[in-house]
Amino acid sequence: MNILYVDYGNVVSQHHMYQYYGDLYRELVKKATVHLYQGPFHSAKEIDNSNIDCIIFGLGYFTQTNPKVYQEISGLSDVSIPVVCMLHKPQTMLQEKIEFCKKN
């Protein structure tokens, strides 16, 4: 299985202060081919015709406080790849995060 793991701020490192941010990523790497993307994700154009089987937005993605990162990602809803959101920190911008998950 090929997984695109989208996260933010290098939180998947085993040396990160809060290691649980990267626990899922580190376990997935043992079982699948995982492509890590860290940073803002604006368009699904690059993955439309790729061999990605699943897209996961990790815990670190949902620590961001910039509302722009929770906007609709261009073309992602048109791609027939399952998208998983690891919703995190619901006390901050919960409605924006829920809408992000619905739209994408």
What spans do the regions from the language model cover?
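Extended catalytic core of nucleotide-activated donor transferases of GT-like folds
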Residues: L4-N104
